[in-house]
Amino acid sequence: MPWLQVRLAISPEQAETYEDAFLEVGAVSVTFMDAEDQPIFEPELNTTPLWSHTHLLALFEDGTDAAAVLAHMELLTGGPLPEHHSEVIEDQDWERSWMDNFQPMRFGQRLWIVPSWHAAPEPDAVNLLLDPGLAFGTGTHPTTALCLEWLDGQDLTDSHVLDFGCGSGILAIAALLLGAKEAVGTDIDVQALEASRDNAGRNNIPEGKFPLYLPEQLPQVQADVLVANILAGPLVSLAPQLSSLVKPGGRLALSGILAEQGEDVAAAYAKDFELDPIANRDGWVRISGRRR
């Protein structure tokens, strides 16, 4: 079934006004997207993270009169609309399109991330089967890739690993497949824990080797290896707690950090860790080191 799509170029300050107006005139969905391929920076507390130049996309059922929608929008918002464009688009199998675009990826020397519906390119390699849905990590983001490559380069034999902010479980499961004895996962999102559990089962990881906790339930572990791919703000504020969870001589890898935030995050861990040079990819960085 075809749809009418209306696109507006807006600022973050206009987002709520135009979203409400589009829903008022009958839009079946309203979506915000980046107009300039910018990353979303960490927002202030209690604010909605949006790009400085944002496109708002409103979708209407087939047969909707675009001119009438735009005229009604001007009445509701009290003036001329920002730069806009309307077109009729054909329906697609969005899930199938996404699946077709998610292909096997290699990280380091040994590790492959392979969609569960795809044959492994190297059956004898370390193949992590992943079916994350659309919400959690797949390995395509530079921060996840930096962490996976770091794990691939470590000797994880019989180690105890903590994945803080585990999401899909991709880092913890990779560590287990690379030789870790146990990986503990924690996340504030119950759905993330469920995704981790599902992906562990898909990779034949026994439940006892990958216990999962909400942060307030996390026991006081002493990890050989801690990975945390979250955001710079939490990494800085949680530095004392995360440092205490790594045993002396243990290793740490942190990401989810923009390049300009790297020095501040590194400074929060420099007292307790002998830090490696910061690794940078596409404007994102990884900080790693060994516990003093």
From Swiss-Prot:
Keywords: Cytoplasm, Methyltransferase, S-adenosyl-L-methionine, Transferase. The keyword Zinc does not apply. CDD domains: AdoMet_MTases. S-adenosyl-L-methionine binds at T144, G165, D187, N229. It comes from the Bacteria. It is found in: Cytoplasm. It catalyses: L-lysyl-[protein] + 3 S-adenosyl-L-methionine = N(6),N(6),N(6)-trimethyl-L-lysyl-[protein] + 3 S-adenosyl-L-homocysteine + 3 H(+). It is an enzyme of class 2 (transferase). The keyword S-adenosyl-L-methionine applies. One of its GO terms (biological process) is methylation. Transmembrane segments: none annotated. This is Ribosomal protein L11 methyltransferase.
